[in-house]
Swiss-Prot record:
Organism expressing this protein natively: Mus musculus (Mouse)
Entry protein name: Transmembrane protein 253
Main localization category: membrane
Protein topology in the membrane: Multi-pass membrane protein
Sequence intervals crossing the membrane: 33-53, 62-82, 96-116, 138-158
UniProt keyword annotation of Thylakoid present: no
Disulphide bond pairs: none
One GO location term (cellular component): membrane
Superkingdom in the source lineage: Eukaryota
Signal peptide per UniProt: none
Length: 204
C-alpha cells in the first residue's frame, strides 16, 4: 500500500515508448516524412547558389558562404527526423528538438546578415553585374528562410506530441488554489469561536 502511495505518477518507459512509436509511425508519419525530405532537399538545393555567390564575391572563400552552415544543420536535422520516423526513440525526439532549435536560430541569423549584405552590395555595384548576383543571393536567402520555416513547423509539431500537458497543469494549479482557499475557510471557522469566547471573558 505504501509503495503504491509513494510511487511517482509517471508513465513507465515502455508505455512512453509505445505512445512515441504510435505517434511517429502512424499519427504523424506522413508529416515527419515531408519534414525530413524538405529539410534534406533545402539543404542540398542551397549549396550551388551559395557557392556561386561566394565565388562571385570573395574568390570562392567558403568561410564567407554563410548559408552553408544552416544548410549543413538542416541536412543533419533531416537525417535525425528520418531516423525518428524509422525507429522512434526518446533521445531522438530530444535531438530533433535541439537540432531544429539550433537550425532555426542559425538560419535566422544567416538570413538577416545575407539580406544586409545584399542591400549594401547592390548599391555599390553596377546594374549589369548586380542582376545575376542578386538573383543568386535572393535564391540562397529564400532557401535559407524556407529552412527556418520548416524548423519552426517541426518544433510546433513536436510541441503537439502531448497536447493535454498544459491542460493538466492548469487543472492541477486550479485544484491547488481551491484546496488552499478551503483550508483558509476552515481555519477561519475554527478561529471564530476562539475569538468569540475570548471576547466574552473580557466582557465579564
Amino acid at each position: 500500500m505504501d509503495q503504491n502511495a509513494n510511487q511517482p505518477r509517471q508513465e513507465r518507459p515502455s508505455v512512453r515508448l509505445e505512445k512515441l512509436q504510435h505517434w511517429a509511425r502512424h499519427k504523424q508519419s506522413g508529416r515527419l516524412l515531408v519534414l525530413a525530405v524538405s529539410q534534406v532537399w533545402l539543404a542540398i538545393a542551397m549549396v550551388p547558389f551559395t557557392i556561386s555567390v561566394s565565388c562571385l564575391t570573395s574568390a570562392c572563400h567558403l568561410v564567407t558562404a554563410l548559408p552553408l552552415w544552416p544548410g549543413a544543420s538542416g541536412l543533419l536535422t533531416g537525417i535525425i527526423t528520418l531516423e525518428l520516423r524509422r525507429a522512434p526513440c526518446i533521445w531522438k525526439v530530444r535531438a530533433m528538438m535541439i537540432s531544429n532549435t539550433f537550425n532555426l536560430i542559425l538560419g535566422f541569423v544567416a538570413v538577416v546578415i545575407e539580406v544586409m549584405k545584399t542591400a549594401l552590395g547592390t548599391a555599390s555595384m553596377d546594374s549589369s553585374q548586380s542582376t545575376g548576383l542578386l538573383v543568386l543571393e535572393l535564391s540562397a536567402e529564400a532557401f535559407t528562410l524556407a529552412g527556418v520555416l520548416v524548423s519552426t513547423y517541426a518544433l510546433f509539431l513536436l510541441s503537439q506530441r502531448k497536447p493535454g500537458y498544459f491542460k493538466r497543469s492548469r487543472l492541477q494549479y486550479r485544484e491547488l488554489q481551491e484546496g488552499l482557499s478551503e483550508m483558509e475557510e476552515v481555519s477561519g471557522l475554527e478561529n471564530g469561536p476562539v475569538v468569540a469566547s475570548t471576547g466574552n471573558r473580557t466582557d465579564e
